[in-house]
């Protein structure tokens, strides 16, 4: 509760309600003149989860990235929804799909595996998650205005920060939906990135030929340091102040802990990882072996460092495999 003398206004602030039920409170205000006001306040319950948007990367060069909608209440999955709702293809190689505020952002890298792009093939597709309709297609370009390939995106303070194969981190203003700053990296072919204590940490994979994590000051958008790692760092997550976890990709799918105060790197045994995400103190990793067509999923507790295999009963959960583009 806050009150500023002379303005006759009392401002109430409440923490977000994460419960599945609404909650009520009674507030009693008494003035210096003895006037009492009683208020009954009810805070709405946590919104019911309707479903999930699922991004299919597609096959590079085939222009067949797509989105599916999984309805939680019915267990039904609706495929190829971007084309159905927008009348156009989503694009070539959908590499990431993230929610921030009231919008959803799809990172469309473009065809082939080279580090350069062509006009109108690499962009950020901004989507209304309530309707699946496109809000804006933002053509992705370097600081010099040349078409470039975006790879991943993270958000902080109303801005999106996008890694690029042009060896940059590009800043997106989420209000104006315009690219407004570029940070030049000393590494090559940037992939995953995360934010920790006012710094952006960016994996430079070089498609297997680089071994650096760039440190970018989020205010000045300049590279302020470089951390040497194992070869081919690709994914990275923040797990609290001063602690990051990153993984390397082909040929070694390994998880590492990076302690920032001394830049110590520690290998985490027993986890095979190609993709990962962090949630509530746990890192969830996945790896698919294209030789055996077998997948592996692990949960790694960052506090206890316990590794637990996760076995998904896809049939029991009612979630079919999304392999059709």
Residue ranges and their predicted role:
Residues 72-74, 128-132, 173-177, 217-221, ...:
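Short loop/turn segments that connect beta-strands within beta-propeller blades
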Residues 61-69, 114-125, 168-171, 208-215, ...:
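Structural motif
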Residues 46-74:
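An edge-strand/N-cap motif at the start of beta-rich repeat modules
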Residues 10, 21-33:
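A short beta-strand micro-motif common to beta-rich folds, especially ectodomain repeats
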Residues 1-13:
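Surface-exposed binding patches on compact interaction domains or structured appendages
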Residues 52-62, 106-119, 162-166, 202-208, ...:
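Conserved beta-strand positions in repeat-built beta-propeller and related beta-rich domains
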Residues 76-89, 133-144, 178-184, 221-228, ...:
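A short beta-strand motif characteristic of beta-propeller blades
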Residues 87-99, 144-155, 187-197, 229-240, ...:
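Repeated scaffold domains used in trafficking and secretory/extracellular systems
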């Amino acid at each position: 509760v806050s009150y500023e003398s002379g303005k006759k206004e009392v401002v109430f602030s409440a923490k977000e309600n994460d419960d599945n039920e609404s909650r009520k409170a009674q507030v009693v205000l008494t003035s210096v003149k003895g006037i009492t006001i009683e208020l009954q306040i009810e805070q709405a319950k946590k919104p019911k989860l309707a479903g999930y948007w699922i991004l299919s990367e597609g096959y590079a060069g085939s222009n067949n990235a797509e989105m599916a909608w999984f309805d939680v209440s019915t267990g039904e999955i609706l495929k190829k929804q971007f084309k159905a709702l927008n009348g156009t293809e989503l694009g070539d190689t959908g590499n990431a799909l993230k929610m921030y505020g009231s919008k959803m952002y799809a990172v469309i890298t473009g065809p082939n595996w080279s580090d350069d792009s062509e006009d109108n093939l690499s962009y950020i597709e901004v989507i209304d998650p309530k309707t699946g309709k496109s809000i804006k297609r933002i053509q992705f370009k370097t600081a010099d205005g040349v078409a470039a390939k975006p790879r991943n995106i993270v958000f902080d303070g109303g801005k999106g920060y996008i890694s690029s194969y042009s060896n940059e981190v590009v800043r997106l203003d989420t209000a104006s939906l315009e690219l407004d700053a570029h940070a030049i990296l000393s590494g090559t072919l940037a992939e995953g990135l995360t934010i920790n204590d006012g710094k952006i940490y960016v994996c430079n994979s070089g498609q297997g030929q680089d071994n650096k994590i760039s440190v970018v000051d989020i205010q000045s958008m300049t590279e302020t340091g470089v951390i040497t790692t194992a070869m081919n760092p690709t994914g990275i997550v923040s797990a609290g102040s001063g602690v990051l976890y990153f993984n390397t990709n082909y040929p070694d799918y390994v998880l590492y802990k990076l302690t920032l105060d001394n830049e110590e790197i520690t290998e985490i045994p027993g986890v095979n990882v190609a993709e990962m995400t962090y949630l509530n103190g746990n890192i969830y990793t996945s790896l698919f072996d294209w030789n055996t067509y077998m997948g592996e999923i692990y949960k790694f507790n960052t506090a206890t460092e316990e590794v637990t295999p996760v076995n998904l009963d896809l049939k029991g959960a009612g979630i079919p495999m999304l392999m059709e583009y």
